UniProtKB/Swiss-Prot annotation:
An annotated GO BP: electron transport chain
Protein name (database record): Ion-translocating oxidoreductase complex subunit C
Location of the 4Fe-4S ferredoxin-type domain: 368-398, 408-437
Membrane topology: Peripheral membrane protein
Keyword Oxidoreductase: no
Quaternary context: The complex is composed of six subunits: RnfA, RnfB, RnfC, RnfD, RnfE and RnfG.
Encoding gene (name): rnfC
Pfam families: Complex1_51K, Fer4_7, RnfC_N, SLBB
GO molecular function: 4 iron, 4 sulfur cluster binding; electron transfer activity; metal ion binding
Organism: Vibrio cholerae serotype O1 (strain ATCC 39541 / Classical Ogawa 395 / O395)
Length: 773
């Protein structure tokens, strides 16, 4: 079985799927040789004329530059410099419309030529075989050479990807696009330089075989190459004319029957493809030292009076070429297309400059090239799928692209589309399919860039967050270490930490306060127990209202303790907040606290002053307890007085114990007084009746009885007044008791007074009756 190289040398060819045979119309521009276009009045040089990044500026406005002088510099392999096409002055650096389907503006250098054609110093390398591949790649990169037959990929970067792994070098001379003849005429006139460029690339890549693929519609170019390549180990293979056989993947399929893997490049399968225009530029850059400052441009279409190929300086406005070579616009449908009718795009205006990838300016009439503005609905005929050279599904791709379903477009391998235009050419509905695909690709590319930028921003944020946390931890460690060093230093000096000392002082003060609080708790518990016992006793005796005097005392005691704790907390706060306070401040705080305590004690003493006069309490006695004791003493006094006044029932009053409640004592006293008055009235009445019945008795003296009754009434009134005063004063001393009911006491006192008055009135009426008698 023959190897692949042997099959190629034997002349075997293969074919790719799909493809079309459009009307070529190449004879308009390939009949005349290439001539130099005139130097225009202004050159517009975009900083980015290739796939990749724009270079960094080396010039500024007002600088004079020489022909071939670098205007930008590169810092990465995807950057290419641009050079001055002629000598002149930099008049502006500003955005201008560039050659792109979008019609957008990019930063450009505007050069005003001085028509002197003064060259920059060149460094030719005619003996290139003595140079290393790396040196040659660097010279190619410095010359700013990019792919001149396709998308404009940097040539040095492409060659570098095939170092030490290229087996077959393929030279693309097919030029399958209708109307375009730039490569055809270039091969006719500059075949020797093209062969020199091939030899330079062979010296860099060292392939096993070199193949030149050229369509059979270029017989003169084939003859020129065969003559220039005599005695050279190269294979010139003439292939059938079929569009798009000039595509990289399609030409590889035709010549080698190999297919580039999905998402891969030809170097992955040991192949390298270069355009004849790029090879001629490589020869000029290495052998003559000239950078890429001009290219061959085809001026064709029925609107040109003299269609031909010209050497145009990069940056030449299209309008200058139109004016020089007899362009006459169509009156009804003026159009200018950069590129061919299949893959080209319409220019927004004629001031767009020529770039490294601009190989043709097509100016057709409306009859020569019809417009595709009459888009109709898809009829699902399937011709687009049959014509696709990449075996895609153009119909489904157009649907998803129109609906902006870009995820589905990617699933259908939209990125593999070479935008050849074969599908749009055969579409009976005249749907501009390539435009939909270009827009979808641009949107997908934009979203991909945004996603990458978001990922980079996320990574930067996470790195920043980690750095901030790391810095925070380092600061905390530094602070801890510094505090530890200070503590050790103070300990060595015999001192102590001020903060620790303040904390110890606060703890000591709290420890001093704890015993006081603990001593109060048993008293509170005892008071609560007494209150509960009295409430239970009241409930058993059937009293309508329980006795809540103990709860009142308990609340008052709690309030007093709260005031004392508040004063003590104030002293503790002052002590803790002022670590370095002197003895004077402490003395002032203590004096203020003592003054507050004395004031509170005086207020409580004044409220119980009058009851305390009867029974003076000791210095340590509680004013509330003193008031209770005074009330009990008054009740005992009244009971003793009642015992002396009424001898009829001396045992009815039951003296209360020292622990009696003042309210109960008051109620008992009132009841005793009422009973005494009632007994007095009964005694008076009984005395009056026997006196009337036996007026002549020796023991009954009416005058003495009247005097005795008057004395009794006077004593009763006096006792009532003293009782009223003594009852009013304790009530005023404790007006805020929640459990005591002042209204009931007042009602009882009023009832007692009313009964006393009634008894007095009855005794007076009896006395008057006796006097009348």
């Amino acid at each position: 079985m023959l190897s692949l190289i042997e099959q190629i040398k034997s002349g075997k060819l293969w074919d790719f799927p799909g493809g079309i045979h459009p009307f070529e119309n190449k004879h308009q521009s390939n009949r005349q040789p290439i001539i130099n276009a005139s130097i225009p009045n202004e050159l517009v040089l975009p900083l980015k004329q290739h796939i990749g990044k724009a270079g960094d500026l080396l010039v500024k406005v007002g600088d004079r530059v020489l022909k071939g002088q670098p205007l930008t510099q590169y810092t990465s392999t995807f950057m290419l410099p641009i050079h001055a096409p002629t000598s002149g002055v930099i008049s502006a650096i500003e955005p201008r419309t560039v050659a792109h389907p979008s019609g957008l503006s990019e930063l450009c250098i505007v050069l005003t030529p001085d028509q002197q054609e003064e060259w920059f110093e060149l460094q030719p390398q005619p003996d290139f075989q003595q140079l290393t591949p790396e040196t040659l790649l660097e010279l190619i990169r410095q010359a700013g050479i990019s792919g001149m037959g396709g998308a404009g990929f940097p040539t040095a970067k492409k060659l570098q990807s095939g170092l030490s792994r290229t087996e077959i070098l393929i030279i693309n001379a097919a030029e399958c696009e209708p109307y375009i003849t730039a490569d055809d005429v270039l091969m006719r006139q500059y075949a020797h330089e093209i062969i020199q460029g091939i030899e330079i690339v062979e010296h860099i890549l060292k392939p096993k075989l070199t193949i030149i693929g050229i369509e059979d519609n270029k017989p003169e170019a084939v003859a020129a190459l065969q003559q220039a390549a005599q005695d050279k180990p190269m294979v010139i293979r003439v292939i059938p004319t079929k569009y798009p056989s000039g595509g990289e993947k399609q030409l590889i399929k035709i010549l080698t029957n190999l297919e580039v893997p999905k998402g891969g490049i030809p170097a992955d399968i040991g192949l390298m493809v270069q355009n004849v225009g790029s090879l001629q530029a490589i020869a000029r850059a290495i052998v003559h030292g000239e950078p890429l400052i001009r290219r061959v441009v085809t001026l064709t279409g029925d609107c040109f009076r003299k269609p031909r190929n010209v050497w145009a300086l990069l940056g030449t406005p299209v309008q200058a070429l139109l004016n020089e070579f007899g362009y006459k616009a169509d009156k009804k449908l003026p159009r200018l297309i950069m590129g061919g009718p299949m893959m080209g795009f319409t220019l927004p205006h004629a001031q767009v400059p020529i770039t490294k990838t601009a190989n043709c300016i097509l100016a057709p009439t409306r009859n020569e090239l019809t417009s595709s503005d009459n888009e109709m609905a898809c009829i699902r005929c399937g011709q687009c799928a049959e014509a696709c050279p990449v075996s895609l599904l153009p119909q489904q791709l157009q649907w998803h692209a129109k609906a902006e379903e870009f995820d589905k477009c990617e699933e259908l391998d939209l990125k593999d589309c070479i935008e050849c235009g074969a599908c749009a050419y055969v579409c009976p509905s005249e749907i501009p399919l390539v435009q939909y695909y270009r827009q979808a690709k641009a949107e997908i590319r934009t979203r991909s860039l945004e996603a990458e930028a978001a990922e980079r921003a996320k990574a930067r944020f996470e790195e920043k967050k980690a750095r901030m946390e790391r810095d925070k931890a380092e600061r905390e460690n530094r602070f801890k270490q510094a505090a530890e060093d200070r503590r050790k230093e103070m300990q060595q000096q015999g001192g102590s930490d001020a903060i620790a000392a303040a904390i110890e002082r606060v703890k000591a003060q709290k420890a001093q306060l704890e015993p006081t609080d603990n001593s109060v708790k048993p008293a509170i518990a005892a008071a609560i127990a007494r209150a509960k016992a009295k409430q239970a006793e009241a409930a058993q005796s059937g009293a309508s209202e329980p006795d809540n005097s103990e709860m009142a005392k308990l609340r008052e005691e709690r309030k007093r303790q709260a005031r004392e704790r508040k004063a003590q907390k104030g002293e503790v706060t002052e002590a803790s907040t002022s670590d370095g306070a002197d003895d004077k401040k402490s003395a002032v705080a203590a004096a203020i606290a003592r003054a507050k305590a004395r004031k509170a004690e005086q207020q409580e003493t004044e409220s119980a002053a009058q009851p305390a006069q009867a029974t003076p309490s000791s210095d340590d006695a509680d004013p509330k307890k003193a008031a209770v004791a005074a009330a009990i003493a008054r009740a005992k006094a009244r009971k003793a007085e009642q015992g002396t006044e009424s001898t009829a029932q001396p045992a009815q009053a039951t003296p209360s114990s020292d622990e009696a409640d003042p309210k109960k004592a008051a109620v008992a006293a009132a009841i005793a007084r009422a009973k005494a008055r009632k007994a007095e009235q009964q005694e008076t009445e009984s005395t009056a009746q026997p006196a009337q019945a036996t007026p002549s008795s020796d023991d009954a003296d009416p005058k003495k009885a009247a005097v005795a009754a008057a004395i009794a009434r006077a004593k009763a009134r006096k006792a009532e007044q003293q009782e009223t005063k003594s009852t009013a004063q304790p009530e005023q001393a404790t007006p805020s008791s929640d459990d005591a009911d002042p209204k009931k006491a007042a009602v009882a006192a009023a009832i007692a007074r009313a009964k006393a008055r009634k008894a007095a009135q009855q005794s007076s009426s009896n006395l008057n009756a006796e006097e009348k008698d």
